[in-house]
Each structure stands twice: as C-alpha cells, then as structure tokens.
C-alpha cells in the first residue's frame, strides 16, 4: 500500500499557481486576493502589486465556503464552535461515509454503469463498480522526492511574517513528485517545518488515497497523521477506515482502531477490525493486533494477531486457515505457513490437525533457477486411527516424500525427476495432500531421466519404478533402466528420409505371494487365489522379467504438392528378448502352451517384422456460402495402405503393451497395439475423407470425417489368451465405419462427436457426443452435456489374470464378485453453472452409469458471488473408493456430503477449499471461469 503524504523539503521552495503566497517581509499581515491585483517582482526583489482597477470601484468581497482564511493563532469563532461535528468513521459500521459524498465519489468510486469498456475489462463480473484513480499532474512522476519541487495551488493565501505562518484557503493542492495533498484550508508553519490541513483532506500517491477531516504533515520528512480517515488502494480493491492514520517517514501506515476489507463502499459484508493495523507498502503485507473478523458488523472470529497481503507480492507468514469435517478424519484444521525465502525459492508448511488421526505435518520447498524448476516435499503422521490396524501393508507411522524436477544442464541436456514414495498403499485413500503436483493414482511414479537433444536425434536415459497405492491391482513392471535413441539421418539422397528408433530396456517386478488380511485381520478371499495377493493370478510367461532390445530403421520418400501428397514407407522392426522366469511360471507355461493364445517359455526370443505402408491424400477447396456466411470448403480424401506379415508372438510376454481402441485415427496407424511387445499383422486399405468449412477470418466453423478400412486377411496377432477365431472383428473383411463431426457455433459454443458403427453386427461399437457452452465475454455461464458409449473395451482382469475384450465381465460367472459387462461404458454427464439473478448462480452435475444403473456423481447447489466475498453450498453424492478389499467393485461405495465454501476476497478461503478440487475435476470450463474472476 503505497500510501504517502507529501515529503516536502526543509525550506519548501514553492511554485505558486492560481494564488499568491507572500513570502517577503511586510509591515503588517494582510490578505491579497490574486484576482484583484497584478503583481510582478520589483527591482529590489520584492513584490510590486497594482490594483487592476480603483479600489473604491471594487464590488463587495464575496463570501466563499471553504475559502475563508483563518490565522493559525486565532481562537475559533463561536460560529465554528457551534458547527455540527463531523461524522466519525467508527459510526459507519464498515461502510464508506455518505456524509462525505452520497455516491462515495470521495473514495474515487465509479459505479459499473459509468465505467469505460477498458475499465470494465479489468473489473470483476460481480463488482458494482471500481476505484478509479483520476488523472492528475505528476501521477506518473518518478523523480526522487528530494529532487522534486513542491507545487502549491489555492484560491487565496496569507503569510504572517512574524509567526512565519502561511495560510491557504479554497481548493488547496500541494504536490511533490507523484504525491499530492488536497484540503479546503492549510496552515504551513515554516519554523517547525510542519503543516496543518483542514476540511476534506485527501492525500494521494501511486494508486492509493487517504481521506480525512484534518491532517498534520511534517514537511521535511513526510510524516503525517490524518484524522477520521478512510483509505483506498485502487488496484487491490482494498479500503478501510481508522480514527486516525499515521504515515511514518519510511511510508509505513499505522491505523488506530482501523478496518480492512475488499467490499464495496456501501457494503459491510466482512471486514477485519483491529486496534492497531500496520500497512507496509515496501513488503506488500499488513499486520493487525486484537483483530476480529466481522460479518455484517457481527464478530465471528478473533485472533490476537494476523498477517495479510495488501498486494500480490509474496511474504512470509500464515496463510488463511481452512477447516472441514469428514468421517475419515473428524474435524480437520489446516494452518499453512508460507516462507518467502528468496525471489526464486520458497517453502510452505501445512500443519494439519485431525481429531481422529492426530497431527499431520506436511511441507514443500519450491525452487526456480535459470535452467530448472521443481519442488521437494514430505509429510509425516503418527496415526492414532486403528481402523486398518489388522489390514495387510498398513503402517501407523505414515509418511510421504516427493520430488518433482525439470531442468537443463545446458541447451541440449535435459533432466527430469518425478519421484514419490509412501509408507503404505492406503495413504492417499485416508489422507489428503496440499502439495502441488502430487497425484493420488493406483500407483505413484518414481522416475528419473536424462535427455540429450542432438541436431538430428534425441537420446534418453530413463529409470522408472512404481509404488503401489492400492491392493486391487497387479504389481506393474519397472523400467530399470531404459535407453532410447530416436532420430533421422542428416542427409536425404534422392529425397529419401532415413529414420530410426532404438531401445534397450530392463523390465523387472517382484510379484508378491503372501496372504492378504482385511481390516478385521481375516484372510481376504474376495479376489486373490486362496486369500493371497492378486499377483498370484499372474500365470505362465506373464510372470517373466527380462531385457528387451528393439531396433526399427525406416526409409520413406515424401512426395508433396499443393494439391496432395504420397509417402511410401518401409520399416523393419527387430526385437530381441532375454527372459527369466520363476519355477511357478515355467510350470504354468507348460500347461498353457496347448491352449489357444498362449505360448511356451524360452529364455531368448528374437522377432523381426517388416512394415510397409503408403500414405496418400489430395486437397480440394471451393468458395461457398451457408446461411449468409461465406466459407472456403475443403475436401481432403486420404488413402492408406498397410502390409505387415504375421509373426507368432505368443511366446513374448507383455511388458508395456495393450491394444488401442478403434477410432478414426486408428485407420491410419501402422500398429494397432501400443508398445513394442505386439506388432499387429495387417493387410488393409484405409479410405477416409475430411471436409472443413473455414470462414474468411480463418475460423473453422465445422469439420466432418468418415472412413473405413478394408481387410484382405484375418488379424491373427492377439493379446495373451485371446484366440483371433473367437473375435468377430479379427475376421471381418471391413472395419467399423468411423465418423467424426465437430461444429463450432461460434467461439463460445461447440459440439464434438465421434461415432463408430459396426456393419457386421449392425450395432454401435462406440461413440460420444459432447456439447460445451461458455461465452468468451461472460465465462461465468457454463453448460456441458455429454454422452459416451463403448462396447469394445480391452482390459486386464486382475481377478482372473486374463484379458477381456468387448466390454468384458469382472470375474467369472458364479464368483461372488462377478459383474457382467463390468468394463462396458455407457454414461451421460451433465453439468451447469448458470446465473439466475445478479450475483446468484446455480451449480449442478449429474453423471450416470447406465450399464450398472447407478449414479456416479450428483451434486447441486448455489453460489453467491460479489466483489468482496463468495459463498458456495453444494449437496454432493459420489462413488468413493476405499481400499478395504482386493476386489475393486467392493471398494466402490456411495458417499454423501454437504459442502460449504466461504471465500473472503483479499483474505482467501476460510472454509471449504476442497470444493475447488471436485468442481475443477467435474465441470469443464470451471477453471477458465475462476481464472477470469476477481
């Protein structure tokens, strides 16, 4: 808060404008009105003043309110004593003083309807106006104060030589540099280097304003005291008042019995009220003692001390606390403390007290250098909750450590670290984290990588492991290490491109075979074999660890023209495996070898597969019009031929491979599998066409794509345990029709859809449709409506150790946890944030699973938002995941909660910060809405 009074120099050399200040010695003190005399400097250095006309022809002197002169030594008149006393700011109950101006213009307040377009763009959507600093001379002056002259302007002036008192009256303005003081009347005491301002006092400086009845200014230091004061910080939308405001020489402002709020002048929705409030513009923070948080002038919270921001700068201190209550934690209070250690690094401590669990200490350290950025974090809790005491892998000494880092040792060598470790797999299910970048997935990442970027190649050394954060999944493979080199040769003889991909990687995991107990200490028979880990369901060569070496050189000949392109390409993929398998896996592999879709174990396997493709396309366009709008319509046919011979790959385990889902883009891929462990055999011709409607300004109004693949042979290469003869789509002569349609009503409305229809079964294979509305000029309005259907999912069932195709079941028929079509997707999702009356919005979301006839999430509530505070009240139902069983469906249980969020703008969230997370995740457009809000 750069709140400063004019720091006039010791002898205050004055440039007098609009009035006359007599500084030369006179026999007697008298008043001279500038509008009645012409004055010039005489030869002796004094003033030579001549009347404009004979004195006896002067009209009677008019009486001007606010321009009458009084001597600094004269006693107050009886009339002054009987005048009404000014209204005190303490009587305003947090509002601006209407006695100073009915429309609060004395605080530079401008109603919303009077703001310019540029000012509206900088004003929050629910603010009734803004504090606009008026343009004035010198407001952008950056001249040092000790080098700046002082300008004084007044209607009339008087100087008493013997007392060395200068008196100014009528629209008094004193300015030095960027600072300006205004008043009805001023007395300047030259001998004491101080001044007195009386009546409608205003002191301005660099985006701040202090208004009062009287002020005392020390002219040589700039120290000042303003009585019955109101203050405003224009850009921060901050205002307040005090019995008096003191400005020290170093520009620190101290308020006696002061207030602080971001509410509009006519509102007392909330305010901080303290005996002593200090605002430090040098640090950008304020402090207050004996503070009460008042809502509608009713005290709701007390603290003996508080530390708060007055601008956007960082500073060490307590952040706004948050509290909540849940069944897992009980009442929870978080009191973060921020450490502003340096401009490029900081730290935050999050003490989190939970009545059911104890005190969780969590902290993070962030850093930023010229070549890197990242954060270190950790947490510790001695958990006194014993609900999981008997459950496998539970630890009551709970902890988490993490490190995220991205940087470059030079312009070519890049470094990356994403490492998280936790004490037990239930950490994120039971506890929350306030650290940035920490995600609660089924596994936590433990990765470090070095990347070298050459002129024509990229080399990468990667080490990646995973820590389990659930019991209901199979232990994944670690890559320890992985080396890749991908690039292109720097020369192109005859227009040919030569590229290559190489990889050497070690896959390793430690499958567990111990018993699993539930929270009661009983064996968990829900999913594992005989109460053992789910890892025991992994069988045969799927249990193998090993090394994989892959080399894939390619040669292509791109031929391009303005009307189209043709690119033939030949790639050769060579892969070598060195495998090791435990005794259990070898026995199971022997038994499985006779079954379709399974292979036998070999410690060394090599595979080489050629891949030939020809990608081609044409481009046509024409000018057209639709509904009175001119467009350029394009027509872009595409043809893609792919030939890959069949290679038996059933002896190869899956380390990082799965089958991709069918869509329009998959028509033009050279492998229907992700990863390297499977290369799909193909002999197909894909045909597709895309058309676009593009406006004259380049805006793409809509586009439509349709395509289909023609197969000339069956697709025999499959995932383990899957026989291509049992898959109709592996034997079909044609692929499903793939359609994509996108329509952009304008830059605010859009409709995105895709549809895949199987002509063999005459049924929908998959599809989705999503409508999104969010006006660019009013992003507070959000509407989302979507539907998605997929009956061709390919998933690994951890309870059986097999792959399921086509929306498969969970478990086997007859099992207690069997669920038919568990992996099939058929859902709708509707969400809306919509203003119903000014400052009131409705918030709702409904996500429903038709396949299992259940609601995944439903919430509804309202939001009140204005310029200084926000309130949200939301009733929410959702499917929660609490890992008490190895059977994933048993861990899915409905939960319900009523969430209240209160945000005091300028202080932060007081309660209910968790609301932000599920609104951000559940409603598309919510983050954009919040980013533009004040």
UniProtKB/Swiss-Prot annotation:
It is found in: Cell outer membrane. It comes from the Bacteria. Disulfide bonds: none annotated. Residues 52-86 are annotated as: Disordered. One of its GO terms (cellular component) is cell outer membrane. Residues 1-33 form the signal peptide. Its main location: membrane. GO terms for biological process: Gram-negative-bacterium-type cell outer membrane assembly; lipopolysaccharide transport. Keywords: Cell outer membrane, Membrane, Signal. Component of the lipopolysaccharide transport and assembly complex. Interacts with LptE and LptA. Together with LptE, is involved in the assembly of lipopolysaccharide (LPS) at the surface of the outer membrane. Belongs to the LptD family. This is LPS-assembly protein LptD. The gene is lptD.
